[in-house]
From Swiss-Prot:
The keyword Ubl conjugation applies. Signal peptide: none annotated. Pfam families: Tektin (PF03148). Ubiquitinated, leading to its degradation. Deubiquitinated by USP16, promoting its stability. GO terms for biological process: cilium assembly; cilium movement involved in cell motility; flagellated sperm motility. Keywords: Cell projection, Cilium, Coiled coil, Cytoplasm, Cytoskeleton, Flagellum, Ubl conjugation. The keyword Membrane does not apply. It comes from Homo sapiens (Human). InterPro entries: Tektin-like (IPR048256), Tektins (IPR000435). This is Tektin-5. Belongs to the tektin family. Microtubule inner protein component of sperm flagellar doublet microtubules. Interacts with TEKT3. Its main location: cytoplasm.
Length: 485
């Protein structure tokens, strides 16, 4: 009779089953990595934190090949022994199991000891690596602070020089504006001189050397004024460029000051500092926009740009100083030439006036002489009328002689000759009287012309000597012409 299954006691009676127990898999040594790896921080839960940390896999349950086939037909054993012999093992199985447990324990202890040693070495290596990296970071931060301090000093030095140059340029611009305004006074004087000289009369309204110099002076003053104003405009544009460069330097200096404060704070951080904390994922964020080369080049370019602006400013200041020197010399030379032309013209007009006055005096003397001559001629003519009347009366009386007494005797001839002579004398005197009267009229006209010319010359002298030269007694001094007040 056969029964399905066997009891625990009867299992000893059945044939021995070969149950091969597989050994534990070999455990691999951990791999030590020198690079930074993400790690789990205490107090945080992750998705795989619930899984057990096992160093080996549990061996799958091995089944005997005979058991798989015997399930269809259980062995034939006694019913009374099946329950007692079902869970029994052989001594060999027991020894093998104990040896297996001992070997497993020894393997676990060996692995634990090896892992402990490796962990201690790992701790030492990582501690040393962390300390070295922290020291290296501190050195790098210190070097960075030195670099920032160097560029800050360079930027501050350049900024101070640029500010000084801006002040100097502002002073030159103010001098140019003052000098341009100072030119208005001599320009107005020159224009007033031209306007006054337009009031000359007659022939004295001549385009003389004085007028040429005045026109040249007006043109020169306007040209100088225009040059100074144009240079002031160029300086104003350069000052705007300088202010732009100044703002760039100030912004760069401010950024470097902020970066220096931040890096000093980072440099002074220690493991025991109170303000340190975890900031997860910051190492994955790259918000930088420059590298050390471009960072240094940026400040260097700003300094070079500022130096170029200062060079342009220095060139403009030198140009302004040269312009001051040249224009002031030209204005003074032209002012002197115009005054010399005025003096020469005044001397010339004075000489002509003196000559005219001399001629007028002589003319007046001649008029007086002519008037006296006319008076004498008139008296002489009147004096000759008596003898002529006597002679003519005698001839008329002798014409009344009778007959033969009408003789052409010597008295008759003398009387006739006397009448002709006196008559000829009267005609001559009358002719001379008319000539003298014409001469007197000419002298009077000459006197009028001379007096008119003297009035013209007096008006010219009044304009040139009193009005024009009265205004031209003063001229802006050289310091005022170069913008110094």
């Amino acid at each position: 009779m056969e029964f399905l299954g066997t009891t625990q006691t009867a299992s000893y009676c059945g044939p021995k089953k070969c149950c091969g127990l597989t050994s534990l898999p070999a455990v691999q040594a951990p791999v030590i990595q020198e690079c930074y790896q993400p790690y789990y921080l205490p107090g945080y839960r992750y998705l795989n934190s619930w899984r057990p940390s096992l160093f080996y896999k549990i061996a799958n349950v091995q089944t005997c090949p005979d058991e798989s086939t015997s399930t269809l037909r259980p062995p034939t054993i006694l019913p009374t022994l099946r329950s007692a012999l079902f869970s029994r093992y052989s001594p060999h199985d027991w020894d093998q199991s104990n040896q297996l447990q001992v070997r497993g324990a020894e393997a676990s202890r060996l692995w634990a000891s090896r892992l402990t040693d490796d962990s201690m070495r790992l701790l030492q290596d990582k501690d040393q690596l962390t300390h070295q990296m922290q020291e290296g970071t501190c050195r790098n931060l210190g070097q960075r602070l030195s670099d920032i301090g160097f560029w800050k000093s360079e930027l501050s030095y350049e900024l101070d020089r640029l500010l000084t140059e801006n002040q100097n340029l502002e002073t030159v611009k103010r001098r140019l504006e003052c000098a341009a305004n100072e030119v208005n006074c001599p320009l107005q004087v020159a224009l007033e001189c031209l306007y006054h000289r337009e009031k000359r009369i007659g022939i004295d309204l001549v385009h003389d050397n004085v007028e040429k110099n005045l026109i040249r002076e007006v043109d020169l003053l306007k040209c100088c004024q225009e040059q100074m104003r144009k240079l002031a405009q160029r300086i104003d544009i350069q000052m705007r460029d300088n202010r732009d460069a100044q703002h760039v330097l100030e912004r760069d200096l401010e950024d470097k000051s902020s970066a220096q404060c931040i890096d000093e704070k980072c440099f002074n951080l220690r493991n025991t500092s109170d303000c340190i904390s975890f900031f997860h994922g910051m190492e994955k964020i790259d918000g930088t926009i420059s590298v050390p080369e471009t960072w240094a080049k940026f400040s260097n370019d700003n300094i070079k740009h500022s130096q170029n602006m200062r060079a342009n400013s220095i060139q403009l200041r030198e140009e302004a100083e040269h312009l001051f020197e040249t224009l002031s010399d030209q204005m003074w030379r032209q002012f002197t030439d115009t005054n010399l032309a005025f003096n020469a013209r005044i001397s010339e007009v004075t000489d002509v006036k003196n000559k005219l006055q001399t001629q007028l005096a002589k003319t007046l003397q001649e008029i007086f002489q002519a008037e006296n001559t006319i008076m004498l001629l008139e008296r002489s003519i009147m004096a000759k009328e008596g003898p002529l009347k006597v002679a003519q009366t005698r001839l008329e009386c002798r014409t009344r002689r009778p007959n033969m007494e009408l003789c052409r005797d010597i008295p008759q001839l003398k009387l006739v000759n006397e009448v002709f002579t006196i008559d000829d004398t009267l005609q001559t005197l009358k002719l001379r009287l008319r000539e003298t009267q014409d001469t007197l009229q000419l002298l009077v006209m000459t006197k009028c012309r001379l007096e008119h010319e003297l009035a013209i010359k007096a008006n010219t002298l009044c304009i040139d000597k009193e009005k024009c030269m009265g205004m031209r007694k003063t001229f802006p001094c050289t310091p005022r012409l170069v913008g110094h007040t």
